[in-house]
């Protein structure tokens, strides 16, 4: 079986990670004590991707939990699913990273990293045929961003031919805990560009907007935001966890989704959106799901896809529905909005259907888009970074841990290069020289 080793780092990474395990354990019929109480063979057929089968028929997540302070892990261990995880897989320090990327990456985190790698190695050795790793973390703090990216590069060194994917929570001024977020995020992106194969950008700004505008929550809490993250992660990993043909493992997903190695930052989306305690009032049909799924308001990254073009798209429908109708609806979206899909990658939209819907819904759809509009997210961080960096504000926290200003300058220019690369492919047309083919001029003008 093709296994995935899951790593969660830092407070945010551990909170969304714990939520992810709750949701998928429920979908696979795994009780909080690790016993299987499911009712369908589909639940168990590929359960080995994320779970080890221990003695006594217990299922144990292939998860490694990492933090530089004990707090978040204590609450996971004391929570409902705390007994699910292997006790040796909790690796934590005492000092904390103080929301400082340098502490996570170079000092405190670097001291703990070998202990973590030992546990990861043990998990990887227990795999029959390891396909890769997934990391949940945030880019705004110290541990998830600094130590998370350190772990990625160390894992990459040791397992160079395995796929590395990350669920990265991108900071936003709307939901801000830390004034250092733009620094931490930029330094992290600098690492992710080089060292991950696929990164799902989960943007706090977008999560906040969804809670506020769509779900009408006056004061969204992190619990509300994390609920959205967990349905998205459940949807994105459906193809990996249930039997099916399309994007059935991390490598196939990467092959379909990443046309150029640096451009591997995906925008996830989900439909229908509902608050965590509200049941969906009515079932949507396939047409409505498809329409919602492509809607900017349903995206988990605060970028408008209409400001860019899709390089590639993967869609995942869940529930009992007609395949034919799904294909028709997906074709219709592409035909009506053809200018938003680059014409130089034919068949760049892939669709999969899985019979088992998420809990509480008859059917749902998950969207993964590789769109050039994601540059808006990087521009937003870059602007905030530059505002602080040109005044050298707060830099002493980083240089005090042994960092050099040069590294900031490099990270800044790497992120700006990334933005230009997205722009370059947004403007690219099918013919090389950039000459207009006949009848193409009006289409370009309408693009502008």
From Swiss-Prot:
Q: Which superkingdom heads the taxonomic lineage of this protein's source?
A: Eukaryota
Q: What are the GO cellular component annotations?
A: cytoplasm; microtubule
A Pfam family that this protein carries is Tubulin
A single GO molecular-function term is: structural constituent of cytoskeleton
Q: Which residues bind GTP?
A: 11, 69, 138, 142-144, 204, 226
Which region ranges are annotated with the description Disordered? Answer: 427-448
Q: Binding of Mg(2+): at which residues? A: 69
Task: Give the main localization category.
Answer: cytoplasm
For bias type Acidic residues, the affected ranges are 429-448
Could you list the residue ranges forming a coiled coil in this record?
Answer: none
Cofactors named for this entry: Mg(2+)
Q: List UniProt keywords, sorted A-Z.
A: Cytoplasm, Cytoskeleton, GTP-binding, Magnesium, Metal-binding, Microtubule, Nucleotide-binding
The entry's family comment says: Belongs to the tubulin family.
Q: What role does this protein play?
A: Tubulin is the major constituent of microtubules, a cylinder consisting of laterally associated linear protofilaments composed of alpha- and beta-tubulin heterodimers. Microtubules grow by the addition of GTP-tubulin dimers to the microtubule end, where a stabilizing cap forms. Below the cap, tubulin dimers are in GDP-bound state, owing to GTPase activity of alpha-tubulin.
Q: Name the chain's protein.
A: Tubulin beta-1 chain
Which species is this UniProt entry from? Brugia pahangi (Filarial nematode worm)
């Amino acid at each position: 079986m093709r296994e995935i080793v899951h790593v969660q780092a830092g407070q945010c990474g551990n909170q969304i990670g714990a939520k992810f395990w709750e949701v998928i354990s429920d979908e696979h019929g795994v009780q909080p004590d690790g016993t299987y109480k499911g009712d369908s063979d589909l639940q168990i057929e590929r359960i080995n991707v994320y779970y080890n089968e221990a003695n006594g028929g217990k299922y144990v997540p292939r998860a490694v939990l990492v933090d530089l302070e004990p707090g978040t892990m204590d609450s996971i261990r004391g929570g409902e699913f705390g007994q699910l995880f292997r006790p040796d897989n909790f690796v934590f320090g005492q000092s904390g990273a103080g929301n400082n990327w340098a502490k996570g990456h170079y000092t405190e985190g670097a001291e703990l990293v070998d202990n973590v790698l030992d546990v990861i190695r043990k998990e990887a050795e227990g795999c029959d045929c390891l396909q890769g790793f997934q990391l949940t973390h945030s880019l705004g703090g110290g541990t998830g961003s600094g130590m998370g990216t350190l772990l990625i590069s160390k894992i990459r060194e040791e397992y160079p031919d395995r796929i590395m994917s990350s669920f990265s929570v991108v900071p936003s001024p709307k939901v801000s805990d830390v004034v250092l977020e733009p620094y931490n995020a930029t330094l992290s992106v600098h690492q992710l560009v080089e060292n991950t194969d696929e990164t799902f950008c989960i943007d706090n700004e977008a999560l906040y907007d969804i809670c506020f505008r769509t779900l009408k929550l006056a004061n969204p809490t992190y619990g509300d935001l994390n609920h959205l993250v967990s349905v998205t992660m459940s949807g994105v990993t459906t193809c990996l966890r249930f039997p099916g043909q399309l994007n059935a493992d991390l490598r196939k997903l990467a092959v379909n989704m990443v046309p150029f190695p640096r451009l591997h930052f995906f925008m996830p989306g989900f439909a229908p959106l509902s608050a965590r305690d509200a049941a969906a009032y009515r079932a949507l049909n396939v047409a409505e799901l498809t329409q919602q799924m492509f809607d900017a308001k349903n995206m988990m990254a605060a970028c408008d896809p209409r400001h860019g073009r899709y390089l590639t798209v993967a869609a995942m429908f869940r529930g009992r529905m007609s395949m034919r109708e799904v294909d028709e609806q997906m074709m219709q979206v592409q035909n009506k909005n053809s200018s938003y899909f680059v014409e130089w990658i034919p068949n760049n939209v892939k669709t999969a259907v899985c019979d088992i819907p998420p809990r509480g819904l008859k059917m749902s759809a998950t969207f993964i888009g590789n769109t050039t509009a994601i540059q808006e997210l990087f521009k937003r961080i870059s602007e905030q970074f530059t505002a602080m960096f040109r005044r050298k504000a707060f830099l002493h926290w980083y240089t005090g841990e042994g960092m050099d200003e040069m590294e900031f300058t490099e990270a800044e220019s790497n992120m700006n290069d990334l933005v230009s690369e997205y722009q370059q492919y947004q403007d690219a047309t099918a013919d090389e020289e950039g000459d207009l083919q006949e009848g193409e001029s009006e289409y370009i003008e309408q693009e502008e």
